[in-house]
Amino acid sequence: MGIRSTSVSDAVAALDERSREIFRRIVEGYLESGEPLGSRNLSRLLPMSLSPASVRNVMSDLEDLGLIYSPHISAGRLPTQIGLRFFVDAFMQVGDLSAEDRASIDRQVRAESGGNPVESMMNEASRMLSGISRGAGLVITSKSDPVLKHVEFIRLEPTKALAVLVGDHDQVENRIIELPAGVTSSQLAEAANFLNAHMSGQTLPELRKQLSQLKDNVRHELDALSRDLVERGIAVWAGSPDEGKPAQLIIRGRANLLEGLAGAEDLDRLRLLFDDLEKKDSLIEILNLAETGSGVRIFIGSENKLFSLSGSSLIVAPYRDDDDRIVGAVGVIGPTRLNYSRIVPMVDYTAQLVSRLSRNPL
């Protein structure tokens, strides 16, 4: 029975010492060079004495388990995607980052090139992750919530008005609202003045939290029509629970993905990957993948339906805001032969660092 029908632990238990060692050498050789390893070379690398014929017998058993395969006749063996998952779960050792590595990541991520310090930090994080991997570094940032600066209602027709919200960096959001029957221009102005007095300096999520308190104030300060108008304005600006979904993908190191392409088939897979990364739904899906675990998630090839056609691997971890809510993700995407044991702790540390720095910008 192959590994497809058994758990990883069952498969590990079924392998003896020499099978484990041969499998480990095949995977490590693939991760290092991308090239298949043959029985003759393997017999020279092994710590135990085994003839090429004995190595071939073990390789045949590993192939039956679905852990390795031969890319073409008379070639060595490469790990399958199932074999890579098996290796990552059962063999890979992820150590702690050295103080030097942590200092290097801190220095690169904190490197500020002017402008918005948070945006600079995200760009540097993406660039740094690209530099330490053979893939592309990515950062998904959540939609920022503007601090409210000014509110205005502009009548469009008797039953409709344009609700205008101006943020602290002069970003403008316009929403059309239905007007209560009989509302006057003076009541529009009165409602806007009330909101400017009570909402200025807050973000939309903060406004949402204070909705009930504002309603109490409205009852004391405004007439019925103005109260209705204020509540409609608050409701339309507060938006939906999905308002904070990711809005931007920062990706660096796309050129890394061009290295080692073997032909038209590899180029087609890369094109599919780039197409996937341009889709808004893909960003949401990546963030959803990051949210499903407590730390770093590893998706190899077809395990992740998002990039299954391109055969890419994704290593991703979420970062959080002051309220411990997941607001974005950092990671690396690239070929399946990424250096997982080195990249995983770096993605993990980078996510923690971005969480800290986004709460307290540079």
Curated annotation (Swiss-Prot):
Keyword Transcription: yes
A Pfam family reported for this protein in Swiss-Prot or TrEMBL: HrcA
Organism: Rhizobium leguminosarum bv. trifolii (strain WSM2304)
Protein biosynthesis found in the keyword field: no
Key words, A-Z: Repressor, Stress response, Transcription, Transcription regulation
Any one of the GO BP annotations: negative regulation of DNA-templated transcription
Biological role stated in the UniProt entry: Negative regulator of class I heat shock genes (grpE-dnaK-dnaJ and groELS operons). Prevents heat-shock induction of these operons.
Family recorded in the similarity comment: Belongs to the HrcA family.
HAMAP family: HrcA
Protein name from the UniProt record: Heat-inducible transcription repressor HrcA
UniProt GO molecular function: DNA binding
